[in-house]
């Protein structure tokens, strides 16, 4: 994992060196800076139309229609019954989360995100023990729970729990390497969509509790102390297909998908509900609606835009996944960046949303991450480890079953977004006087900027987040806000040798030829990296 960190840092440094020294790489396909993106004369593409506040819906606090369960809920796999996952995710090391958390604890009486509530709008969140009573019911816009849980605290799909775990999980086992970004923050769960539910008139009778088919274990209550490696799909007696698996393929979790629960209207209603509560400081939306760009805006999109604007006006930081490429969500790789092929909502409304692209463990942009002028920042989105979403499981998951016995790594922009939402919670805890706009600006300004005009591009936005910098740097834009001293840090470099002028002379003598050779080599390596074949793994 540490190797990925070093390689990623080297890529950023060498890219900046190339652009700054020879000045010819920036025009080669690099997107225009965000301020240069304007709507086409014949419609709205890169930039949405102005907000129409009259489109903000009234929250009905219930599903938009009756949905019934068509597939069984996610379960633990037989293969994962006795597997313990103690490995620290590469993303934690890459982002130096342990150091970031210590900085906040030093400033906030030992708490890392305590007192900050983060709303997770997703497939629901299972009551995993590693939330340690920091999980609250927000609401359910899909259906009533099947086992008496409070609204929003059932996760049949196995998606929302993994997202929430990245934000705020706090394992009580010191041997476990995984920990959430803001492990003292509180999660408020809203179940807004599910691929395991469908409109009642189009579905069969829900399967009886405990009825499953396929490969998962029949036991939903694992032996005490065991940890799950695989949160597999289950198809349920009354449904067909791959259970929870479709959410990890073909574009990830999508709103307005035929035969499933989850609409733009209910997403907008939840945002209004959150805005009216006055206690939630951060929102994470790892749900998207992706469509072909046609120059227009739909009624549902207008509702979401108005609701997002309303929530942002209530001092709430809104974070969204940038979206995953799929059959119905084409990559924005067109020559004219002002006219994307694909529109993704909520990220499209970038004035009020911080959308997050994904990188892999080499520091490269993940091939499934949708590009666009709305991308704000980027974070780790591959080889994910998080909480096992199966009901009753006390452990972690790092794989998901796909098509029966096929296991796949957990990945997607869905899991990059919670890294940023967690960071927003830490920033809000450390700097309680900053408003939502200032928090977003701090995250952007302290990110590792790409070598592109304006310090941003359409792939990673303003760059990969840098939590330590976001929690320590003083920004000129924050008048009167002073970043506190991060305190002494452990030295990362060996002590300097005795002074000698010989190395300096040799280094200077070889600079001319060596730099040219280095630039040529790195340019070739970068070209090869950009043209590598895309992995075939599914995304969520």
Model-derived regions, located:
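Substrate-binding/access-modulating region of protease and related hydrolase catalytic domains
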Residues: 197-345, 406-411, 415
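C-terminal subdomain of the subtilisin-like protease fold in secreted/lumenal serine endopeptidases
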Residues: 431-540
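Extracellular S/T/G-rich loop segment that most often corresponds to the catalytic His/Ser-adjacent loop
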Residues: 344-426
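Secretory targeting and sorting signals
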Residues: 1-40, 508-527
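Sec-exported extracytoplasmic/periplasmic mature domains
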Residues: 105, 168-172, 192-195, 272-279, ...
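Active-site core segment of subtilase-fold serine proteases
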Residues: 43-45, 49-262, 276-278, 392
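Loop/turn elements at helix/coil->beta-strand transitions in domains of secreted/extracellular proteins
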Residues: 113-117, 183-188, 276-283, 313-318, ...
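Solvent-exposed loop/turn segments at secondary-structure junctions
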Residues: 123-127, 141-142, 172-173, 193-197, ...
